[in-house]
Amino acid sequence: MLNPTRLLGSLVLLAASTQCAPSKEVRADVEEKCSRVQVAILGAGLAGITAAKVLDDAGITNFTIVEYNDRIGGRVYNRAFGRQPDSDEPYFVELGANWVQGTESSTEENPILTLVRKYNLTNTPSDFDNLTVFHETGQVHPGRLSERFKELQSLYKSATEEYEYDAGEIILQNQQDRSARAGLAIANWKPSSEPLAQAIEWSSIDFEYANPPEKTSQQYSVVNTNTSFQRWKDENNLVHDARGFATFFKEEAKLFLDERTQLKLKTIVKNITYSSESVTVYNEDGSCITADYAICTFSLGVLQKEVVSFSPELPRWKRTAIQSMTMGTYTKIFMQFKPEDVFWDKNTQFFLYADPVQRGYYPYFQSLDHKDFVDGSGILFVTVVDQQSYVVEAQDFDTTKTQIMEVLRDMFQREIPDPIDFYHHNWTREPWVYGSYSNWPPGLTLEMHQNIRANLGNLWFAGEATHPQYFGFLQGAYYEGKNAGEAIASCIKNKDGQWVEYKDIRQ
């Protein structure tokens, strides 16, 4: 792995301070019609709640959080699923974010881990080496195919080491970025049509970035991985607490948030009118809020779909940047089987499937029915991303279930009863998110990314997609909410706090 100091020293957060625009009195007719606050926070996900807490800590309590859903949580979202064998009580599964990614070093913790520990959320490190490999005629047993799999793993490891070194050189030498596919090929990793090689690659690239190598930046994929997994320990702790992963920031919100006066749930924003003097938010129910400052924490997917209008229209440099980043889709498909029908080795965490025809076709199964997770639950889930996610979302549950069961019967070479419960969430079709999390594609420059983040007058933007290093991670949402809250608190206290923008970018 690259030295993170080497990379991060070359990738500084692009921020510049200029004098904040003073808020001024708004027109009397707007004042009369709309409720009035100092700060409007749009979205009650992790970025929004973190920004609100920062403001509250600074003594700024005249704010309102506006949220589309009937809950705090955003993409950290669990759901009742299946039934416990000895009662009618359900289990709970995480439909969205599920892991604490990067845990701690000798000197500091990932802030997500700190909060998970604060509220005693049950979490366990995933062991990605606890893996059994399958193809269409069953398990890859010791023998020729098993040796080939080990050989491919070794080749991939060597290629990724060169790939990561090259990413550092791209940054240090200010070279043109390229796709992860090109970078891996230069490092002599060329899986072409070999299913085992494709499966290994999928479990490393697609499973992490919700996009294939062709859609992923070599340079920034390495920055993204190194900042989490070298700054902190290279661990992924799966949260499997029945209270839900979002508990940690729901509980934080209870410490300061007055839900009667500072939180508007089930409120759909339709227009944001902004200037260097104030921001007015118009909602579908006819209500409106005028604020001195606003923080927009909408997902990249919502901004790309343009389902919320802006007045004036977002400048071209910002629209270009928004459309140039990628919103990935990561779909977990859950199945519960009767205890007597569990057909997999309960000591194994992961099952990798190398489909002979289609790369990424129901490739990665994970067992929750394991002594370290939700023992006795009979729950197995499979993850798909990108194009396969879109296919799954477009077809009915029965079709998807039939396809998965055909794969499982090929893998395990036996008759397997259908699951007693089955569910997946359609993230791409959710009108409040339109996807799972962001990814950095080849061709998106650091300056263009900063334009997603840059404020427009008194309107600020924050979320996992706006962080140049932790995009796609919960810690990205946390840090960006914190940064935006601190910047606006600084503005309110008549200090500097504007972020830089790049209106004229020439490649």
Residue ranges and their predicted role:
Residues 5-12, 21-507:
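FAD-dinucleotide binding site
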